Structure formats: structure tokens, C-alpha cells
């Protein structure tokens, strides 16, 4: 089953899934929900391409984090999905999940330095393209 927030929210908006469950509303964050770093699949693909070029030209390897370095809360994502979809994301608030950290945001400094990579998509672009994909006919 899908567990990623944006596709789960879009499926809930489209009536393809039950209400989305928001786990935790008492984290030490501005709105009490977890903060995560959301990245567009096209940005990931660009970074992987840059990494392949780097590997071709260098010996060894590097561990490199990829992210936008921008944290967005669960509630902020749901608001953005609602704005783009034109419908409120049906959701329920629940208890925290054991082990969920309040905030996870990646540093992309090494990716910038070594690969010359910078993500091109913001949260609005991520949600907009996911919304188009989820509305497209399936064959």
C-alpha cells in the first residue's frame, strides 16, 4: 500500500483511498506535525544522472544526500494539496507513530559541491505534477 504523504493525500482527495491519517499533532514543530523534506522525482533523476557522470570521471565513490533543504510539515503539505486540487484533503488526526522523528531535512551541500546539482522543483511544482499524474487515465 502507498505510504508516501503526497500520493496518499491525492488518492484521498480523489476518493481512491480512505481518509488520510495524520500521525501526531504534538511534535515540537510550529503546527505540531512532522516536518519532512519533499523532493520531485525529476530532481532525483537529474541528481542520479549527475552522479553517473561523476562516477565515470572519478575513482571511488561518495555517499551524497539529496533533498531540497526545506522542511515542510504534514499540515502544510495537506494545505498545498487542497489548494492545487481545489478540494480539502479528507484526514483524521491520530496519535504519533513510535519512532517518528519530529523533523527530517536533508542537506544537499555535498550534492551541490561535488555534482553541481541543485533541485529545480518547489513543493507547489511537486504537488502539481503529482496531481496531473493521479488524474491521468490509466490503461
Residue ranges of model-derived segments:
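Catalytic helix-loop patch of NAD(P)-dependent Rossmann-fold dehydrogenases
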Residues: 1-4
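C-terminal substrate-binding subdomain of Rossmann-fold SDR/epimerase-dehydratase oxidoreductases
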Residues: 6-139
Amino acid at each position: 500500500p502507498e505510504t508516501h504523504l503526497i500520493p496518499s493525500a491525492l488518492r484521498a482527495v480523489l476518493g481512491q483511498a480512505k481518509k488520510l491519517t495524520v500521525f501526531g499533532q504534538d511534535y515540537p514543530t510550529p503546527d505540531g506535525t512532522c516536518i519532512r523534506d519533499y523532493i520531485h522525482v525529476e530532481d532525483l533523476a537529474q541528481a542520479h544522472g549527475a552522479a553517473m557522470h561523476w562516477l565515470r570521471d572519478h575513482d571511488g565513490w561518495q555517499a551524497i544526500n539529496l533533498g531540497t533543504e526545506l522542511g515542510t510539515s504534514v499540515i502544510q503539505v495537506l494545505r498545498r494539496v487542497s489548494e492545487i486540487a481545489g478540494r480539502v484533503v479528507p484526514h483524521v488526526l491520530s496519535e504519533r507513530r513510535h519512532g517518528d522523528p519530529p523533523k527530517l531535512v536533508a542537506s544537499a551541500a555535498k550534492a551541490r559541491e561535488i555534482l553541481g546539482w541543485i533541485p529545480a522543483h518547489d513543493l507547489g511544482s511537486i504537488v502539481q505534477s503529482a496531481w496531473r499524474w493521479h488524474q491521468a487515465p490509466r490503461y
